[in-house]
Amino acid sequence: MKDRDAGGRPAALRRPVDGILLLDKPEGLTSNAALQRVRRAYRARKAGHTGSLDPLASGLLPICFGQATKASGLLLDADKTYDVTIALGERTATGDSEGEVVERAPVPAMDAASVRRAAAGLVGEQEQVPPMYSALKHGGQRLYRLARQGVEVERAPRRVTIHELRLLDLDGPRLRLEVRCSKGTYVRTLAEDLARALGTVGHVASLRRLALGPFDGRQMSTLAEVEALSASLADLDALLLPPDAGLATMPAVQLGVAEEALVLQGQAVFAAGPGGSKVRMYGPGGRFLGVGRMTAEGRRLAPDRIMVELAASASVRA
């Protein structure tokens, strides 16, 4: 049947929703499957997720609704924080516990001090080669599809930054650490690198995302909680953060009535702000208009992404 959503609901019954839900994605579910279940509960016309999580991983997955999807790409550049458990002594094809064991090695005796020294050597900017089991493309095909066919191709290294790698627990051949890293970092590769620095091999046994950009786990809702409220749209909407919540670290520029009108027409205006920076734009009364960019000298503002329809929902919940 034509024009139905993922749950079989006619498109006419879907509604406009604007805002951001901080979902606690459960293990064993793809990010897209989680997105579709949330979208179905909200009966939302438009939704997308920011910062995909592997099925094995759990934790913070921001779901952007409506016009908030226009700003979701900006969150992809944000730093992320993970709680990871690494199992030493076995390397798998996928770099996590879902893959076949392809190498075993003895685990040398170690204490917390030796683990911290090895971890310190991985902190900072570095070149990281993405794993074959990843969603990156080569020749139009996903790398993980090639890997499943037994094909391995050369992957260009990517520059990433490990801001912090902190040991939380050492229990025999298992290490638990907190990782704060830049976009594009593969924690599975980092786990293998740390195991190698400790004189053995290893893989990710569990992974949980704790934070992404300005968001942390304190405001997350579980999938079960969301679906339990599906009969009460008002209660569901009360879980939403305003659309500009994901831009909290971006400088803000306040515009007057005349400047607001010009910006909404796509025209640059005179305004003071940090030179060369992207900024949040607000009109009279503090309504969120979208994202703009200041010129190098910081005296003119050009609109980048107009999100004026979001203004009405900016008061959903701070």
Give the location of each predicted region.
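Accessory RNA 3′-end/elbow-binding domains used by RNA modification enzymes
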Residues: M1-H49, L53, A57, A119, ...
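Glycine/acidic-rich beta-strand-loop module
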Residues: K46-L76, M132, R145
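Residue-level signal for inorganic ion chemistry
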Residues: I63, V84, G140, L190, ...
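Extended alpha-helical targeting/anchoring segments
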Residues: S134, H138-H163
